[in-house]
């Protein structure tokens, strides 16, 4: 698995998304699949940058690997910030009135609904959030 370590600050978002998307260059992914992966990466990294170490700054590691059978990308986000399982919270309410509330949770709901797998663990003092997206097994994924 290739990895990138950066300070968990929003200013590093472009570097993180570029790192992930570059690994998909040779797989002919559809625009839809790339956008779903990009949005998931952005949501997760911005959440880490905003809350993991607040008010200080710490490192975040992003690991990315394209796997075979089925063809898919596995992306892991690791940080040593305070323990936080974004999957433990009940899914956000998507009714019209709730969309204007500040309860949060819409971002992780988007990740859960667009990725094929999402898991969280806390090991050796690190939050580890793993997302997985199939690259060829769906009609619109990759050509």
Annotate each language-model stretch with its function:
Residues 1-4, 8-10, 112-143:
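Flexible, glycine-/charge-rich segments associated with ATP-binding catalytic modules
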Residues 2-31:
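Helix-loop-beta hinge of the Bergerat
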Residues 20-42, 100-102:
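Conserved short strand/loop->alpha-helix "switch" segment adjacent to the catalytic nucleotide/phosphoryl-transfer site
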Residues 43-47, 113:
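Conserved polar catalytic motif of the HATPase_c/GHKL fold
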Residues 52-57:
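A short, flexible helix-to-loop-to-beta junction within the catalytic ATP-binding CA
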Residues 58-66:
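A conserved short beta-strand within the histidine kinase catalytic ATPase domain
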Residues 71-103:
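Glycine-rich/acidic phosphate-handling loop/turn and adjacent ATP-lid/helix
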Residues 99-115:
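Glycine-rich phosphate-binding loop
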């Amino acid at each position: 698995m290739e990895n990138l370590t950066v300070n968990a600050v929003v200013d590093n978002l472009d570097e993180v998304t570029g790192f992930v998307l570059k690994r998909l260059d040779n797989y002919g992914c559809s625009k839809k699949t790339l956008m779903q992966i990009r949005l998931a990466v952005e949501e997760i990294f911005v959440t880490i940058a905003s809350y993991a170490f607040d008010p200080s700054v710490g490192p975040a590691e992003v690991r990315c690997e394209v796997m075979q059978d089925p063809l898919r990308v596995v992306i892991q986000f690791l940080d040593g910030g305070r323990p936080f399982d974004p999957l433990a919270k009940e899914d956000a309410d998507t009714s019209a009135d709730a969309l204007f509330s500040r309860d949060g949770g819409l971002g992780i709901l988007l990740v859960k609904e667009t990725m094929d797998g999402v898991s969280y663990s806390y090991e050796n003092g690190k939050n580890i959030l793993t997302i997985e997206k199939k690259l060829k097994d769906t009609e619109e994924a990759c050509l």
